[in-house]
Amino acid sequence: LLILTEGFVTYGGLAGRDLEAMAQGFEEVVHEDYLAYRIRSVEYLGEKLLSVGIPIVEPPGGHAIYIDAAAFCPHIAVENFPGQAVVCGLYRTAGIRAVEIGSLMFGAGDARPLHHYLPVSGKRLEPARRLELVRLAIPRRVYTQSHIDYVVEAATDLYQRRGELRGLRIIFEPPVLRHFTARFEELP
């Protein structure tokens, strides 16, 4: 009976219900109608954001919209994390969770600021300042049209007040994967 609720050791630690949910997801995701609906929903969000002047990466993807945070907040220097400032602004404004993809995620800490490095060789790659994005991922089977419209309204409000956003300074960062648990303070 335990196998039915907790799964078997060969299930990779997943309960039977979780495996069933994954199987259902795999079944649904290959239906053409569903894919067209999903892609269109993301396109809709992108079109609405563009229509109010919010800069995004084009064309929209199939699962997310990427806001160009450097263009959204040109008054915030890269070293003060404009993407994270937008992420915090969206959360404070409307409870919308997003993720920064840029100098915070790909920076390497104070010893090697704002650059990409290969983890094993330490070879330096392109500067992270090329990427200052905010990802608005759209989970499957969760949001309706009105939810997407809410995101547009909140992002529009924040964009109109973007001059109020301030840069951030890291006050704590772990040695690895700093974007998950770093702590910040707003700059004056």
Regions from the PLM with identified roles:
Residues 70-98, 112-129:
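Active-site loop ensemble at the mouth of alpha/beta enzyme cores that anchors a bound cofactor
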Residues 63, 96, 134:
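A broad, low-specificity signal marking well-ordered, structured residues that form hydrophobic/aromatic
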Residues 66, 99, 137:
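Residues in well-ordered beta-strands of folded domains
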Residues 1-83, 88, 104:
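Active-site C-terminal subdomain of aminotransferase-like
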Residues 29, 93, 105, 111-188:
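PLP-dependent enzyme catalytic core of the Aspartate aminotransferase-like
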Residues 44, 48-52, 85-96, 152-161:
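Generic non-transmembrane alpha-helical segments
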